[in-house]
């Protein structure tokens, strides 16, 4: 089997497929309050295109798929997409990232179709604050979605918490306490300058050392834990005696580019080899032309930078030669 390897020796076996750029929320770190101009439906990859693409990609070593958006559960055919991917025997793991507004309704059907596990965005445990950060989200719907995911066996369940200075950084201990009674992995993620103009993001950025300081202040003893299924770049820990775990993902202060194994496919059919790099290859016209398609995929990988240059300098400045122009919802979170 010919593997997808870049010039730095990184083998790519994981792809994140955005199935829509649409979302029913407007999270402050993902989309402007006024929203975005969404792709016309005919510009979005169809179920058959997604499945055909993956039937080819598995021949080159891709074996893990994460479905993203926008909000992927807005796709009326999301269960059929999962079922189509689940029918490809070489795919070992199918996961989804969701805001969970519709997860309670769809979790059982998704599990039956072949979904392995779920990541859920949850940036506050206070209903009013959650509504403010998401610009309209209902916390109880997320909690119901978590419960349903537990019931149907979508494990491990991971909760993605973007740490935002002045908005939810006083809830760190609450999230840590959440892991004591639930077998859930809470992942604290640094606020990233994706698609943001200027340097205003720095006003909301907090280094993740804050998490460990909160543990110490609360008197929580914690220890590293072994790899969690699909853990990716997260460094994971467990508070002694807790059922669940917590992790930290720091793409800004300590990037993990040297071990990056992922590609991204946008909802409109562009391959991105790096989240924070503008270069994209339009593969949609060639989904039925495997030779040309794989030439483009390999070209994207060949041009992948050694790192995304989003690391902080001493003065907390971002160095970036080619920052991405897309918002996170347009790339696939």
From Swiss-Prot:
GO terms for molecular function: 4 iron, 4 sulfur cluster binding; cyclic pyranopterin monophosphate synthase activity; GTP 3',8'-cyclase activity; GTP binding; metal ion binding; S-adenosyl-L-methionine binding. [4Fe-4S] cluster 2 binds at residues 257, 260, 274. GTP binds at residues 16, 66, 97, 158, 262-264. Its cofactor is [4Fe-4S] cluster. Residues 7-221 form the Radical SAM core domain. Keywords: 4Fe-4S, GTP-binding, Iron, Iron-sulfur, Lyase, Metal-binding, Molybdenum cofactor biosynthesis, Nucleotide-binding, S-adenosyl-L-methionine. Belongs to the radical SAM superfamily. MoaA family. Monomer and homodimer. This is GTP 3',8-cyclase. It comes from Listeria monocytogenes serovar 1/2a (strain ATCC BAA-679 / EGD-e). The lineage of its organism: Bacteria, Bacillati, Bacillota, Bacilli, Bacillales.
């Amino acid at each position: 089997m010919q593997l997808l390897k870049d010039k730095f020796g990184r083998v790519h076996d994981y792809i994140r497929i955005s199935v829509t750029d649409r979302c029913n929320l407007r999270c402050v770190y993902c989309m402007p309050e006024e929203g975005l101009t969404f792709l016309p439906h005919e510009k979005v990859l169809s179920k058959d295109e997604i499945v055909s693409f993956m039937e080819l990609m598995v021949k080159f070593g891709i074996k893990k798929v994460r479905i993203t958006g926008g909000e992927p559960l807005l796709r009326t055919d999301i269960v059929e997409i999962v079922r189509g991917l689940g029918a490809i025997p070489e795919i070992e793991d199918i996961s989804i990232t969701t805001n969970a507004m519709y997860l309670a309704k769809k979790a059982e059907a998704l599990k039956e179709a072949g979904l392995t596990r779920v990541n859920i965005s949850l940036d506050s445990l206070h209903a009013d604050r959650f509504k403010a950060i998401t610009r309209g989200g209902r916390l109880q719907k997320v909690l119901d979605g978590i419960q349903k995911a537990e019931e149907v066996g979508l494990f491990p369940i991971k909760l993605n918490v973007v740490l935002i200075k002045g908005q939810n950084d006083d809830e760190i201990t609450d999230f840590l306490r959440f892991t004591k009674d639930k077998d859930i992995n809470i992942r604290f993620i640094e606020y990233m300058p994706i698609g943001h103009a200027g340097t205003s993001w720095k006003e909301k950025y907090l280094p993740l050392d804050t998490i460990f300081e909160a543990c110490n202040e609360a008197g929580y003893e914690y220890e590293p834990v072994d790899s969690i299924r699909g853990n990716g770049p997260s460094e994971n820990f467990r508070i002694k005696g807790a059922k669940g775990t917590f992790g930290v993902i720091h793409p800004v202060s300590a990037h993990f580019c040297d071990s990056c194994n992922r590609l991204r496919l946008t909802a409109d059919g562009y391959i991105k080899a790096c989240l924070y790099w503008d270069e994209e290859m339009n593969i949609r016209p060639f989904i039925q032309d495997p030779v040309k398609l794989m030439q483009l995929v390999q070209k994207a990988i060949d041009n992948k930078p050694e790192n995304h240059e989003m690391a902080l300098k001493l003065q907390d400045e971002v160095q970036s030669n080619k920052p991405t122009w897309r918002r996170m919802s347009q790339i696939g979170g």
